Amino acid sequence: MNDQIPMTILGVEKLRKELEMLKTIKRPKIIKSIIEARQHGDLKENSEYHAAREEQGFCEGRIKEIELKLSKARIIDITKVKNNGVIIFGSTVTILNLTSNQEFTYRIVGDDESNFKRKLISINSPMSRGLVGKKVSDVATIKTPVGDVKYKILKIEYN
């Protein structure tokens, strides 16, 4: 079983920066909050202490999650991947909705990098699954909650 997680170079850097921030800034701040809260006496009814401990749990959980993802990361540099003119992980694709006649441009990225507002869609999304492997001028049928939607591939970029 392949448990590697595909990521772009930018995606890996983003996770590394978050991990560093959690370890060097957030974790020490939480520890300081716990120490200060302990000084307020009885821990059973000390809401500051319990809140800090809960925050510590979330922080440590996120650190472990990021470390695991980075250990399984398969970094894909789109500029060095043979693409054969088809949509692949990391490519930027411009598509035309054949029903509404609207154009959209998306980049296909890893799960942690996806951000629909920034037009970054996960490789595991229905849209990506329907687009991967297609060439310019192909029509992709994407299953959506409101039914099938057809998109024509207008442009593929590998940058």
Curated annotation (Swiss-Prot):
Task: Tell me the superkingdom of the source.
Answer: Bacteria
Gene Ontology terms, MF aspect: DNA binding; RNA polymerase binding
Q: Where, if anywhere, are coiled coils annotated?
A: none
A Pfam family matched in the record: GreA_GreB
The UniProt entry, under SUPFAM superfamilies, shows: FKBP-like, GreA transcript cleavage protein, N-terminal domain
Write out the GO biological process terms: DNA-templated transcription elongation; regulation of DNA-templated transcription elongation
List UniProt keywords, sorted A-Z: DNA-binding, Transcription, Transcription regulation
Family, per entry? Belongs to the GreA/GreB family.
Q: Do you know which NCBIfam families this protein is assigned to?
A: greA (TIGR01462), PRK00226.1-2 (NF001261), PRK00226.1-4 (NF001263), PRK00226.1-5 (NF001264)
Q: What job does this protein perform? A: Necessary for efficient RNA polymerase transcription elongation past template-encoded arresting sites. The arresting sites in DNA have the property of trapping a certain fraction of elongating RNA polymerases that pass through, resulting in locked ternary complexes. Cleavage of the nascent transcript by cleavage factors such as GreA or GreB allows the resumption of elongation from the new 3'terminus. GreA releases sequences of 2 to 3 nucleotides.
UniProt protein name: Transcription elongation factor GreA
Query: Could you tell me which species this protein originates from?
Result: Buchnera aphidicola subsp. Baizongia pistaciae (strain Bp)
The gene for this chain is greA
